[in-house]
């Protein structure tokens, strides 16, 4: 039986007696759930006895002019999906419950790791992620928390947050889930028109081509790497996208300095297609 809580105190009271002999997992979401979210739930169930899914469209991670007001809110449908998936508890608080004072005077800043990739065009986004995730960790006090690898930078920031604030929480990165045609699943995919939806899988196709080049091409320096990146950006833009960024870094998101050792890299991209800002990434091991 799935139980939904709107109040922090009610959820904490339900979880309190379970802590002595149950392992608790948290899956934070903003709702409008798809198969990618359900894969996070299934992974959480493999690692814990009790699964809590939060549904909260967090206003602090939206910038001016972004889609806070239009972001799909589908709590009834989400509840049905989570019930069918066997989730134990849903936490669906109001903005007032999460933030008695708006904007919240306390901030959790991620530092340098939040200032590139998505942070370049969304400079306050990860500050908002930091405060909401910190609050959710404090409210739920999970043993395990599951985040999707589609938001690769966010996952790295959460791991840093857990390490720096000494949370005793295991962070699990869940594999990116794709549609049959290769498009990374996202709640914002519904912003795509029918024509744009047909174009959208090309983003992943171009990443795959770049990944193969990175595996097969001897790269001696950053100049050669940037030439491959710029060529891929041009191809993506020519396909109808507007690239926000495309970067290749080490898988911890640090800058590549060793071009001769084992490649443990990640390609990360954000690109606009119509009204949809699409994120994707591919890990390169070779």
Swiss-Prot record:
Principal localization reads cytoplasm
Q: Which GO terms describe its molecular function?
A: ATP binding; pantoate-beta-alanine ligase activity
Q: What is its EC number?
A: 6.3.2.1
Keyword field = ATP-binding, Cytoplasm, Ligase, Nucleotide-binding, Pantothenate biosynthesis
Q: Which reaction does it catalyse?
A: (R)-pantoate + beta-alanine + ATP = (R)-pantothenate + AMP + diphosphate + H(+)
Matching Pfam families, A to Z? Answer: Pantoate_ligase
UniProt-annotated location(s): Cytoplasm
UniProt-annotated binding residues for (R)-pantoate: 61, 154
**Which residues take part in binding ATP?**
30-37, 148-151, 177, 185-188
Pathway of action: Cofactor biosynthesis; (R)-pantothenate biosynthesis; (R)-pantothenate from (R)-pantoate and beta-alanine: step 1/1
Give yes or no: UniProt keyword Transcription regulation.
no
Regions that span the bilayer: none
The record's GO CC annotations read: cytosol
Annotated binding of beta-alanine, by residue: 61
Q: Name the residues annotated as catalytic in the UniProt entry.
A: 37
Q: Does the keyword Isomerase apply?
A: no
Query: What is one process in the GO biological process aspect for this record?
Result: pantothenate biosynthetic process
Q: Could you say which protein family the record assigns here?
A: Belongs to the pantothenate synthetase family.
Family annotation (PANTHER family):
CYTIDYLATE KINASE/PANTOATE-BETA-ALANINE LIGASE, PANTOATE--BETA-ALANINE LIGASE
Q: What else is known?
A: The reaction proceeds by a bi uni uni bi ping pong mechanism.
Family matches, as HAMAP family: PanC (MF_00158)
How is the quaternary structure described? Homodimer.
Q: What does the UniProt function comment say about this protein? A: Catalyzes the condensation of pantoate with beta-alanine in an ATP-dependent reaction via a pantoyl-adenylate intermediate.
What protein does this entry describe?
A: Pantothenate synthetase
According to its UniProt entry, this protein's organism is: Psychrobacter sp. (strain PRwf-1)
